[in-house]
């Protein structure tokens, strides 16, 4: 009976022995922990640099071109005189007055560009 008990104890001892590669920190891969966080940051930095280049190479010239086109359109619009206003029955209908000011002006009224019924244009266009 003693011979049967010995092999069982040896196998139990072998199964309970911890296979260790060294100290506590070495077995938990602390060195690789930092690298696992730094590697995606390096990749993100490369992607952000790519998008910065795309912005400076594509977006800024497009913005400049759009600003130039808007400036030219504004100059063309301001170069000719304002046409005579034609009063149509369906324009500037006032069934009841607006609840602000004198009731005859819209909320975002532009004196130089919007016609007021009964008054006309309140100001001339500025030349600039």
UniProtKB/Swiss-Prot annotation:
GO process terms (BP): mitochondrial electron transport, cytochrome c to oxygen
Is Mitochondrion a UniProt keyword of this protein? Answer: yes
Q: How does it sit in the membrane?
A: Single-pass membrane protein
Mitochondrial matrix topological intervals? 20-53
InterPro entries named among the record's database cross-references: Cyt_c_oxidase_su6a, Cyt_c_oxidase_su6a_CS, Cyt_c_oxidase_su6a_sf
Membrane-spanning intervals of the chain: 54-71
What does the protein in this record do?
Component of the cytochrome c oxidase, the last enzyme in the mitochondrial electron transport chain which drives oxidative phosphorylation. The respiratory chain contains 3 multisubunit complexes succinate dehydrogenase (complex II, CII), ubiquinol-cytochrome c oxidoreductase (cytochrome b-c1 complex, complex III, CIII) and cytochrome c oxidase (complex IV, CIV), that cooperate to transfer electrons derived from NADH and succinate to molecular oxygen, creating an electrochemical gradient over the inner membrane that drives transmembrane transport and the ATP synthase.
The similarity annotation says: Belongs to the cytochrome c oxidase subunit 6A family.
Under the subunit heading, UniProt states: Component of the cytochrome c oxidase (complex IV, CIV), a multisubunit enzyme composed of a catalytic core of 3 subunits and several supernumerary subunits. The complex exists as a monomer or a dimer and forms supercomplexes (SCs) in the inner mitochondrial membrane with ubiquinol-cytochrome c oxidoreductase (cytochrome b-c1 complex, complex III, CIII).
Record's protein name: Cytochrome c oxidase subunit 6A, mitochondrial
Q: Which organism is it from?
A: Caenorhabditis elegans
Q: What is the lineage of its organism?
A: Eukaryota, Metazoa, Ecdysozoa, Nematoda, Chromadorea
- Recorded name of the encoding gene: cox-6A
